Amino acid sequence: MFRNQYDNDVTVWSPQGRIHQIEYAMEAVKQGSATVGLKSKTHAVLVALKRAQSELAAHQKKILHVDNHIGISIAGLTADARLLCNFMRQECLDSRFVFDRPLPVSRLVSLIGSKTQIPTQRYGRRPYGVGLLIAGYDDMGPHIFQTCPSANYFDCRAMSIGARSQSARTYLERHMSEFMECNLNELVKHGLRALRETLPAEQDLTTKNVSIGIVGKDLEFTIYDDDDVSPFLEGLEERPQRKAQPAQPADEPAEKADEPMEH
């Protein structure tokens, strides 16, 4: 991971045209626990996997309330996410106080992009090490946005970020055509199935490690934790078991291992 003199500061470009400090911040997002966002014609849903630092600690909150029509889920550094969430809450309050209307979701995401871009260009600062999935509902309908430490943001029909999130994205891509016509319960189940793909084979979703956020038409942003998640998990079919690979006979020489793939 050492980049010689090209990763000492965020204002230094490498000869290949890369800013390594931003790439390191993107890696912090990949280390966070997975979260999934998806939407239908009427609702947007966030599903997040919660972690506990130890057996003695409570599970960390992964879905945060921003306004009545907006919520976020996070992957990466929780402290950075808390600061960005407070900024978003203040912008929503300002909109209601000054203009007497809720802040459009796309406008809020644009403000977040502007705020997260500043540390990528100024000496002595570091990028925010957190990725956000933003779910909201406004006059344009439901929205799912993804933001990155690089200050890029994307409007998505469905997205997953965090550790092992590629498995969840594969599920979302396979079933994306079904989401727009789903009712709320079916949409949440799709999110849970996608999130379950990020877990090791010996683990499963429980009321302790799952959090759900829902917003939509005539429904303010609501977070479901602990026992409130039970009705959604009860309707979820059991996880299909993966076939175990047959053991190699001891008297046969082991085949030469494949060369490691480059990352």
Curated annotation (Swiss-Prot):
Gene Ontology CC, one term: cytoplasm
Single GO molecular function: lipopolysaccharide binding
Aminoacyl-tRNA synthetase as UniProt keyword: no
Covalent link location (Glycyl lysine isopeptide (Lys-Gly) (interchain with G-Cter in ubiquitin)): K115, K208
Location relative to the cell: Cytoplasm; Nucleus
Residues bearing attached sugar chains per UniProt: S110
Start and end residues of each stretch annotated as Disordered: 232-263
UniProt modified residues of type N-acetylmethionine: M1
Top-level taxon: Eukaryota
Main location: cytoplasm
CDD domains cross-referenced by the UniProt entry: proteasome_alpha_type_1
Basic and acidic residues bias (residue ranges): 253-263
Residues that bear Phosphoserine: S110, S177
UniProt keyword Nucleus, yes or no: yes
InterPro entries membership: Ntn_hydrolases_N (IPR029055), Proteasome_alpha (IPR050115), Proteasome_alpha-type (IPR023332), Proteasome_alpha1 (IPR035144), Proteasome_asu_N (IPR000426), Proteasome_sua/b (IPR001353)
Function per UniProt: Component of the 20S core proteasome complex involved in the proteolytic degradation of most intracellular proteins. This complex plays numerous essential roles within the cell by associating with different regulatory particles. Associated with two 19S regulatory particles, forms the 26S proteasome and thus participates in the ATP-dependent degradation of ubiquitinated proteins.
Subunit-structure text: The 26S proteasome consists of a 20S proteasome core and two 19S regulatory subunits. The 20S proteasome core is a barrel-shaped complex made of 28 subunits that are arranged in four stacked rings. The two outer rings are each formed by seven alpha subunits, and the two inner rings are formed by seven beta subunits. The proteolytic activity is exerted by three beta-subunits PSMB5, PSMB6 and PSMB7. Interacts with NOTCH3. Interacts with ZFAND1.
Stated name of the protein: Proteasome subunit alpha type-1
Protein species of origin: Homo sapiens
Lineage, uppermost ranks: Eukaryota, Metazoa, Chordata, Craniata, Vertebrata
